[in-house]
Amino acid sequence: MSQRDTLVHLFAGGCGGTVGAILTCPLEVVKTRLQSSSVTLYISEVHLNTVNGASVNRVTRVSPGPLHCLKMILQKEGPRSLFRGLGPNLVGVAPSRAIYFAAYSNCKEKLNNIFNPDSTQVHMISAGVAGFTAITMTNPIWLVKTRLQLDARNRGEKRMSAFECVRKVYRSDGIKGFYRGMSASYAGISETVIHFVIYESIKRKLLEHKTASAMDSEDESAKEASDFVGMMMAAATSKTCATSIAYPHEVVRTRLREEGTKYRSFFQTLSLLVREEGYGSLYRGLTTHLVRQIPNTAIMMSTYEVVVYLLDG
């Protein structure tokens, strides 16, 4: 791959990630709050003892739904809070996606000379290498973004800035504090691999269908519109499947990035979540995550493909 091609994929990946992050930021904030332990509701219930008739007070842990969480944020913190962490998100998403797509494209090109071109092995290894590279280089940015999104303040209260967050993390945990949750992110590479394998498979089928069908009679703009919609559908379908399978790592990662020392490692957090909150806690925020990720991934992937097409064309 030439230097120009690498720069094209870097730029296209950055554009796709930035556009998707801006449009879906409010859903990202709601999802992060739902994944954390800070929004658990404690409902007091009075039960009558069947033996002596005395009343017994029991406290039940309940996870609020996406709409309830959204309502709480709007009531207590105001609409601006739905864009908390957007700064670090934009700072991180462009280089993260740029690094990811450049690493993916370079790795895929090299592996095509070793394995069958565009085979499942090629896409799996390329996606894994790209995910590992991007996670390692950008984890500190995502930790700051998560902390800012979990920083709930009432209307009128001074909000913590990204620089204040960085100083706070460094004072409490040092440099290693910026890499909390990275083990869960590495576990999430499985989601990335599943996503790209399915995406490339659907994309290949669409290209085969396009070649086989008699589309020569259609005008160029109609073909381009059809390609764009096809890529968006491929991205949305593949991301839905991958997220549904590998979602628990997202919850574990958010808990690890919370302040405090209760959650220490990936497997310790996983077992603690199941023991204290049940298996359902591993899928807290999944609905909101899917509602956000499907359009975000569709926008990101289609923007990436369009930018590459325009720059290469």
Curated annotation (Swiss-Prot):
Protein purpose: Mitochondrial transporter that imports/exports pyrimidine nucleotides into and from mitochondria. Transports preferentially cytosine and uracil (deoxy)nucleoside mono-, di-, and triphosphates by uniport and antiport mechanism.
Domain of life: Eukaryota
Subcellular location: Mitochondrion inner membrane
Keywords: Membrane, Mitochondrion, Mitochondrion inner membrane, Repeat, Transmembrane, Transmembrane helix, Transport
Protein name: Solute carrier family 25 member 36
Solcar repeats: from-to residues: 4-110, 118-205, 226-310
Taxonomy of the source species: Eukaryota, Metazoa, Chordata, Craniata, Vertebrata
Cited PANTHER family: MITOCHONDRIAL CARRIER PROTEIN RIM2 (PTHR45829), SOLUTE CARRIER FAMILY 25 MEMBER 36 (PTHR45829:SF2)
PROSITE patterns xrefs: SOLCAR
Organism for this UniProt entry: Gallus gallus
A GO CC term attached to the entry: mitochondrial inner membrane
GO molecular function annotations of the record: pyrimidine nucleotide transmembrane transporter activity
Gene Ontology biological-process entries: mitochondrial genome maintenance; pyrimidine nucleotide import into mitochondrion; regulation of mitochondrial membrane potential
A matching Pfam family: Mito_carr
Sequence similarity: Belongs to the mitochondrial carrier (TC 2.A.29) family.
Sequence intervals crossing the membrane: 7-27, 41-57, 113-133, 182-202, 228-248, 293-313
Principal location listed in the UniProt entry: mitochondrion
Bilayer topology annotation: Multi-pass membrane protein
